[in-house]
């Protein structure tokens, strides 16, 4: 059970910190066979030029190989332990299969060490089990949904995320996302029962700019604070409002301007997300 801890204001950097204590998480090192080297780019491309702003620095990390396909059918597994993963907001669970293999999965809510987990065509509807959408009852809450059969989970993977099976339409299953969007997904795609754990992630407060730097996030400079050569909002005598509707440094409208342009998949969206 997660414990919300508010820090005492012993210093300016501790005054606003709200942390989440997780006594159930593994305190040792991760399973080394499932680790990969992860090198930082600092937002630069192969030419050394910044292609993604506000990236750089941060603590060194290893990537954990997560089983997003859940395709090891018919082999029973047990949750060996829950772990912290620096690469995502969700926690991860280390599974130990009956044949000795170990895999990481996203840790579902209410799943703890020692719980049995399985995947297959007709497994029971229990948190942590993975099966095709066509075999999941209407109204069931799921996470880690595939968008193409066998590609691996792409939807509802962050902390506290979930979707709901809303109905069936021929070869498709209707899925309601948290945004309110109703979407058609092929019934052969897999999903995991339950919602992603670590819902308390949204309650954390870093408390200081330095904590953001530990995560590899650099400062964001406002356009109105720049010179005209650097941003369309830049320049002017004294403080100004920018003089125009909000745009990016490249003059593209932002702050609410719709950018979706994918006609090919528009037919899969039954209802748009809530405004």
UniProtKB/Swiss-Prot annotation:
NCBIfam families given in the database record: rplB_bact
Native source species: Hydrogenovibrio crunogenus (strain DSM 25203 / XCL-2) (Thiomicrospira crunogena)
CC annotations in GO: large ribosomal subunit
Family recorded in the similarity comment: Belongs to the universal ribosomal protein uL2 family.
InterPro entries: NA-bd_OB-fold, Rib_uL2_dom2, Ribosomal_uL2, Ribosomal_uL2_bac/org-type, Ribosomal_uL2_C, Ribosomal_uL2_CS, Ribosomal_uL2_dom3, Ribosomal_uL2_RNA-bd_dom
UniProt keyword terms in alphabetical order: Ribonucleoprotein, Ribosomal protein, RNA-binding, rRNA-binding
SUPFAM superfamilies from the UniProt entry: Nucleic acid-binding proteins, Translation proteins SH3-like domain
Subunit-structure text: Part of the 50S ribosomal subunit. Forms a bridge to the 30S subunit in the 70S ribosome.
Annotated protein name in UniProt: Large ribosomal subunit protein uL2
A GO molecular-function annotation: transferase activity
Disordered, as annotated region: 31-59, 224-275
Entry's Gene Ontology BP terms: cytoplasmic translation
A Pfam family it matches: Ribosomal_L2
Function in brief: One of the primary rRNA binding proteins. Required for association of the 30S and 50S subunits to form the 70S ribosome, for tRNA binding and peptide bond formation. It has been suggested to have peptidyltransferase activity; this is somewhat controversial. Makes several contacts with the 16S rRNA in the 70S ribosome.
